[in-house]
């Protein structure tokens, strides 16, 4: 088990497994921060950031609280741009009940001067060792309560725009394990459709609900991908339905999805815009037969 971080961590300001992300752009922000007079952070909430009435401007330094839902720190890379990307997601759990506006992604990008032969993901993990925020993200545990300070940001994603918190120059304060663990929101898988066609346009539910924890009940699987072990679910076991991305499950060890037509009492996962929209279960326990 990872050790809980009980101290404030501050990035060194050095710079901001699996399939490559299918999106129109990666996080390339590399802001200049004056550490002598850092801007005061605006205290807000994840629900307020995701609200249609949100008026907070991109780049505003904000402070929010949430509970970690990521089973691990997600790492990707772009060797052409020379960046490593790190991500975790959190949800607001108070006040209850849970809503589809509870989730948000924490992102960090670190510049890498050169790549060597070998795994880019491994090199990005090594690069993270010199940045305190990147290491703090890696130390986070599911169910951990955290206070986050970073910059409100958005990202162009598969023809849509998603919200996130840029952790460049940010802070993470661990507050121990949450008293109120995340609760999934019951949702309809036929509403969470992966974008297809040309040009692809991200479904509004993924832009509006990214990072939310959802649960589909009494569904059947279809469309199994034998390479990546992803599959889709719907009430009837046929399209339309939601794509279940198994990235987290495969990253935690060997995973093979079950045959098409498998019935699940429930499938729980994180709403993510990666690959133009999918639901990522956190662990195998999120797939209940």
What spans do the regions from the language model cover?
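OB-fold nucleic-acid-binding modules
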Residues: 19-289
């Amino acid at each position: 088990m990872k050790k809980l971080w009980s101290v404030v961590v501050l990035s060194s300001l050095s710079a901001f497994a699996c399939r490559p992300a299918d999106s129109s752009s990666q996080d390339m922000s590399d802001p200049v921060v004056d550490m002598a007079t850092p801007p005061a952070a605006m205290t807000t909430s994840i629900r307020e950031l995701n609200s249609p009435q949100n008026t907070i401007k991109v780049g505003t330094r904000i402070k929010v609280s949430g509970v970690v839902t990521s089973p691990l720190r997600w790492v990707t890379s772009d060797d052409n741009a020379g960046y490593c990307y790190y991500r975790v997601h959190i949800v607001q759990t108070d006040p209850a009940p849970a809503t589809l506006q509870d989730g948000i992604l924490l992102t960090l990008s670190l510049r890498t001067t050169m790549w060597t032969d070998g795994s880019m993901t491994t090199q990005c993990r090594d690069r993270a060792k010199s940045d305190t925020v990147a290491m703090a993200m890696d130390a986070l545990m599911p169910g951990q309560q955290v206070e986050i300070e970073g910059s409100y940001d958005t990202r162009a994603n598969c023809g849509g725009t998603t919200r996130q918190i840029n952790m460049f120059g940010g802070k993470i304060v661990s507050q121990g394990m949450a008293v109120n663990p995340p609760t999934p929101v019951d949702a309809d898988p036929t509403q969470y459709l992966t974008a297809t066609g040309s040009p692809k346009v991200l479904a509004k539910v993924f832009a509006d609900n990214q990072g939310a924890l959802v649960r589909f009940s009494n569904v059947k699987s279809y469309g199994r991908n034998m390479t990546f072990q992803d599959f889709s679910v719907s009430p009837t076991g046929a399209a339309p339905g939601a794509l279940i991305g198994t990235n987290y499950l495969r990253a935690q060890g060997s995973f093979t999805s079950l045959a098409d037509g498998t019935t699940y009492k429930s499938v729980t996962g994180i709403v993510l815009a990666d690959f133009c929209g999918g639901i990522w279960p956190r662990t195998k326990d999120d797939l209940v037969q």
